């Protein structure tokens, strides 16, 4: 296994545990932030005759696919687990078309990592939908949160079936073939001016504007609208143009849009958008 994620994160712990279970020594990508050069160097240290595995977040996968050296390294793996954030269908399709064996995973710290692979619960995991919210159950569930019984009671309710479940913050549905489809975070839906607005749709519209560049959207409190979408962009699009495009596509709920320009979108060490840092840009 190649450890390309922080070892203190549940996905990183998963890599270490799996490596130990397989009686192998993990190779640690010790670069200052994972990049194609350090990843390729780490892969070169693997046993050339052994099976190869790693876990990545989508942002890492996208970056590695774009470099010829790391693409060859990716192609050498038997399986690459991709999780930690929503992986777009286009990214997964591009990876598979390039000969990279990827498996999408879904879960969290509360489930000891990914427990749904390519939409199918693994082991004794079960998935259920309650009012559009994904719930997960299985032997890997956490007992609760340290010194926070109240939070644990909310996150791990006993449902009508008498069983204990983990109540996620994600919306989803089951596809016709029974696979679980994660459609977004429930906190990605806000009420702005009395109208519901999906921040994922806001981001999608902005990303469709070539002059927007990289985009991240969060919700901020607004005296007029209650809540408003706030976007950090790396391109040159101005706030008025972005607002006009959003209102045309999504309606008046997008009228409160705020935009700030930045050299890059703030991200966590694993490549997720740092929502707290993005919101801080708006004071």
Where are these regions (language model features)?
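AMP-binding/adenylate-forming
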Residues: 2-63, 103
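Gly/Ser/Thr-rich phosphate-binding loop
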Residues: 66-119
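Conserved ATP/PPi-binding loop(s) of AMP-dependent carboxylate-activating enzymes
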Residues: 121, 130-158, 197
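A structural signal for short hydrophobic beta-strand segments in well-ordered beta-sheet cores
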Residues: 127-129, 153-156, 170-174, 217
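AMP-binding/adenylate-forming catalytic core of the ANL superfamily
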Residues: 138, 163-164, 171-254
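AMP-binding/adenylate-forming catalytic domain of the ANL superfamily
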Residues: 251-273
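Phosphopantetheine-dependent thiolation modules in NRPS/PKS and related acyl-activating systems
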Residues: 273-283
